[in-house]
Amino acid sequence: MSDRPGSASEGEGDEIRPYGEDRDSSEESEDDDPEEAKRIAEGFIVDEDEEDGEGEDDEEDEETRRRRRKEEKRRRKKERRMRREREEAELSEDELELIEENRGLREGRPLKRLRRRSGSEGSENDRAVPTLQDMFRDDEDRMEDDDDDLMDFIEEDEEDEANQGETEEQRRERKRAEKLKRREQARSRPELTGVDRSSWDEIFAVFGDGQDYDWALEGEDGMDLDEEEEAAKKDLRLEDVFDPAEIKARRLQDEDKAVANADRPERHQIVNSTLSDNPVFATDTLYPPPDFAAKWVAPKVSFRTQYLFYNQHPEGSYPIPTIDNPQPYPVYRRPDLEIEFEKAVSTALNMMFVQHLEVPYLWHYKRDVFSLLENQGQSSVLFLERDELWQVYVLGQRYRAIHERNEQTRQQWGKIKARKGDIEDEYFTKGLLGKACVASIEAAGEGDEWLAYHYASDIKAIKEEEAFDEVSKKLPERAEREDIRRGRIMKLVEAFGIDANKVASSFQDVHGQPAPVMNPDKMPLELADEFTGAAYSSPEQALSAASFVLVQELSKDPAIRQQARDFMDTCGLVTVNATDRGMSVIDQYHLYYNFKFLTNKPVPDFRDSPQFVHMLKAEEEGLINIAFDIREDMLASFTDALIRCCRSNDYGEIASAWNEVRMEVCNTLVKKHLMPMASKWIKEHLRTQAEEYIAERCREELELRVNVRPYASSGMEQGETPSVLAITNGKGDIRDAVMAVMLDDEGNVRTQTKFDNLRDEEDKTMFIELLEKRKPKVVVIGGFSAQTARLKDAALVAIRQHAIELLGQNPPVSDAYPDHEGFQYAMAEYDEKLKAHLIPLIFVNDATARLYMSSEEAEKEHPNLPLNGRYALGLARYAQNPLNAYCKLGKHIASVTFMEHHQKLIPQEKLLYHLERGLVNSVCFMGIEINSCVADPYQRAMLPYIAGLGPRKADAVIYGIQKHGALINRMAFTDLGLFGPTIFENTAGFLTIESDLKDMMLEAENPQEQPDPLDMTRIHPENYEFAQKMCQDALDLDVEDVADRHKSEVVQTLMLDDKRGKKLGELNLDDFAFNLQRQGEGNKRHTLGEIVSELIRYRSDRRPAFYVPTDWEIVTMVTGETERTVGRGLKVTATVRKAISARVFCQLESGLDAVLERDYVADEDQAPVTSCDEVFKPRQAIKGVVIMPEPARFQVRISTRPSDLRQGVDFVQPFKDEEYNSKDRRDAAEAATAAKKQRRAGKVQRIVNHPNWHVLNSGQAEQFLASQHRGDCVIRPSSKGPDRIAVTWKVDEDVYQHIDVQEIDKPNEYSLGRILMVSGQYRYSDLDDLIINHVKATARKFDEIQMHEKYKPEHELDAFLKNYVQAHPGRSIYGFSVDSDRPGYLKLCFLSKPTKDGGVIQTWPVRVLPGAYKLGNAIVPGVTELSNAFKMQYSEKLAEQGHQGKTPGIYLGKTPMHLGGRTPALGSRTPAMGSRTPALGSRTPALGSRTPALGSRTPAQGGPRY
């Protein structure tokens, strides 16, 4: 990074000048702005004498002030030198604070907002609202000198005689060397700073020697900070030295510190995942009354609770059968407990949102609160299970959002009442805010819109009074409706006799009686004729206008809209219509085939299914259209219910006529307003529902993987951590050595060894010696190819030989036995003896190891380990502690695949949120020993998942314990200020403190200074009294026996008693719990049971045994093949490796071995094959069908017999058959496809003599080009007719442009035209001319843009812009990327300020032409000219809009191209000295005779494929 403001770099923004003039402060002299010079000088020179003389300096000119400053420096020069000698080996106070903060020895200073360091070009106060003023600065500053006017503010000190002749660069280098020398001296004498040498080494390893940030400590002229700059130095903050992005990544922002210090769970303070790179901090608002919230939350908790307590769902539909339990026992409904259930939900909401207790704490320590004891404690009913508690928390958040939105609406109503006096609207306050608007967040928002609709003029007046900005949200069509409703036509509306409020109230009450409707005494048209005139020329128009107003009023009512949504959710039908492209692309092998002909599938059937997100993805790809409908009879029933509330019960001609008009209003309301609105809502609702389902299934899969004990071989005790030897050969290439990494039982790397090949005798011997020396409990193996199977075989041979050596007995030899049966018996006996000495060899799930091996963290932790060695280390760690391995991944856990096909379709933030919940459940189930966790950096990864904590609070806890030392007991958490009361209650039970139980000396005095045996258990401190009482009863001790002892002494005595299980088992917990409940202590049955379990086996690991993958899972992990791809009956393609007489050895593309026996080469009716090597040759490709997969041996047996091939299948759909696929539609589509093929078969296929010609469709052409380079193309037939061809060329990875080429002057139907025209303007003589001068010329412009420093890949561009403006406040930035949505286009994106401050990334399209770029009407030959064109067009747009430099389009949150349907400033000439191309001064030069018209549209760019 350059330290010269005028230098250009990729990181700097450029300046947009809205008025076309240069206003760079570096070009102004100090005399132009003496106040600015004085302000900057004050930032550097802080001598008291100068401060006293500031008033006089104001009257002096700049030259006088500079001379006085120089004299002052000379006067202090000698004193400064003497002081510098004393400070040679010392660190500044600020440096010490930064070091101590990073070591965790002191609390960091509160972070403030980012400030400019002294000497910068301007201050925050001088800068207006951030604009794009500086976006193009680097393009212009490259023309400037390296020096700038900042050098004028501070004169250089006079140097010593010896240094008079040195250059500026030499002087700076000398200064840096002196500073480095001082740092080295301080490092060599750590006692001067209170930092030991090992800590110094660690600090230097992490933060470097500080030279990276020397620029932050240098003055404007490059000089180091001296005496006059000490004040500025003392104000130096973290933001002044470190990049804001790094501060954010380390969670050191002000918001992060606030979260860490607040006495609330971290996950309650952040809306999304605490692991997210972009956390959304929640506001601390008062939660609504839990009793009211419970009435909304309780009916929505789960299928189980709806079935049990609300009599919903068909009888017998719960429990749902599973694979493990296909015929579950029936569960009896308990509707009599509905009120008790709502009380339990209310209690849960109160604990979560008022008391701030997290779900794991409630589940483990407050489960009794959510259950009811019956039959005198002999049975209980559990109201809320663990996952249901999490759902209550989610629903509670939603209810709070609804409540807050309604409160905002209520406040607006209060302002209206205050303005209008005694106005009352009972329907709004009670019917809407009290009922309808509480139903959903959509209804809450509609309540605000209803208020704005009915009180538009009042709200407008209120906003004017409060000086609201014109940018405030504007309701659509309001002006037109207000005009209509203020006119005479409202009298005709009243004549309809329909009160929208009463209709809505009646419509909600199915069994209620509609309000009576009065009829006028005239016919509708007769009455409407009275309102004709200038506004309405006929009674029909007047009646239509009145109907329109009535429809609008009814359609705005939240109650009616909510009824429509509920109706669509219950009775909606979904139909899929494939597009023309979808009909050809989605074949029977496509993932979308199972819903290609989906017809009238009920909306409720999409619950608990990921199918809808696949449908949305297919629609996004342009393959299908999703339609929502409702059966005619159901829709008629809904409409009739609405008509019932609007019609009159009178009889007669007039009443019938008015009822007809009212019926028409209701039909219009339903079909034109309510159903379209409900269809849009249900689409997003089903998306959310499917995403939640996928995220939850991923969480469940994660918990299955991590909720297991460490691997334990026979003979190991429960809870013991194994020593592990991990081996891998990577991809199995000949260049890949076998890496072995040994971890001891404490997780330390004991050795790392490399073997060339374990089949070699020398390497095998070395491997056996390693086993003998390190004695691992288990050997784990992994790899990335089928070659891992060969490594496994070689390792098994070596392990068996090692076991034979330990046994000291050779295996039996067959020659020594008279018969084979005797030999087999002896061999079985020998193997049984050998089993005790065999070290287990297993595969483990390598998902965490794959991510760890390529992570930056792995490279920092083990820089000497090769990539495969880090992978082996990851395998070993997983075997020792799967939970810790997944916790260590942090946010990267979302990269692990838990649900194939589905997981990638949901947002990463949502997935991360649910996966974090899974880790929280798992870590809290097991608990953590806090002292060992803090001492081991690897174990620390689990601490954030303890209830109440998170990454920020965990860092604070680690820092505090490192500062104060290991904890003695749980009271230390609060005594040392590590936890507040709320966090202590959440976390205490999950954090144990290990002590030597036998050596404890417990005394009654000073319990806070002694260990407590209960702290070794997962018993919560609030239950210590129960535990102590139960131990006392189990030991048959009276109260007097323990009166003068430490309260937990009885616990220690019992825990040391080998018969404690029997003694505790004699306690009658049911009676004890029932008596406690009668005494008002509440239900404690579960708590008492957990206490007993912990006292018998404290911190015992209750998780299932370590899960070893199945053979098929191993094959999938190593090769990617599944039972669905190489299962029995599937067709495969194999390559012959070796053929012998009896069989053929082949290999599949995935590396799996395939064996073809001679008997399976040909059918019986064919000529017999006597020798396979006569039929098959090496490297020959053969088609076969799998007849027997053998996953344990990494091979399949195949057959090439024609009869077997006819029965084989090419593909097995990953999804089950959809019962709602229409067979008639499928048959019709297949018939149409067959007819099309028949027509093609009877038609002569066109052949063009050119190497790029291929008979492919658009999709096949893309697949063909996938492995090619940019600019490569395919020429193919066009579906538009015989006089056209199509050219598909590769723009970028996964981006292809399809160009329509018209043939002119064709000799005949099958010959190529003599003129090839693209979009009617680009003419080419032949295909080579078209490729070179059109395709290749366009591709070169893409290559050129990618060489520019502002180009970024499309998926990185947004992050690049956001990170830049965040790291450089006040600056703006722009960048380019390929537009994957519009092949042949570029994106020009720019951002003026951080998104958190309202910045919006805006995008302008840039068309890439053969040899040029087109931005609007400007056609430019190069990237520099493109940037200039952008500057000029943007400046013109600013001038047009008159926003005084503010970014256009920022208020509407839209890209400028959406304003008025046009790209800003693209519809007019680009101003540049009267020329077409900016900054060139002349017309765009001709780019070739073949492409004369660059200003016109390139065909098929971003358009349809041909």
UniProtKB/Swiss-Prot annotation:
Sorted UniProt keywords: Chromosome, Nucleus, SH2 domain, Transcription
Disulfide bonds: none
Domain of life per record: Eukaryota
One GO CC annotation: transcription elongation factor complex
GO molecular function: DNA binding; histone binding; nucleosome binding
Domain S1 motif as annotated: residue spans: 1129-1201
Compositionally biased residues, Basic and acidic residues: 14-23, 100-110, 168-190
Compartment list: Nucleus; Chromosome
GO BP term (any one): nucleosome organization
Bias type Basic residues, positions: 66-81
Keyword Nucleus: yes
Annotated region described as Disordered, given as residue ranges: 1-194, 1460-1506
Chain's role: Histone H3-H4 chaperone that plays a role in maintenance of chromatin structure during RNA polymerase II transcription elongation thereby repressing transcription initiation from cryptic promoters. Mediates the reassembly of nucleosomes onto the promoters of at least a selected set of genes during repression; the nucleosome reassembly is essential for transcriptional repression. Essential for viability.
UniProt-listed PANTHER family: TRANSCRIPTION ELONGATION FACTOR SPT6 (PTHR10145:SF6)
UniProt-recorded name of the protein: Transcription elongation factor SPT6
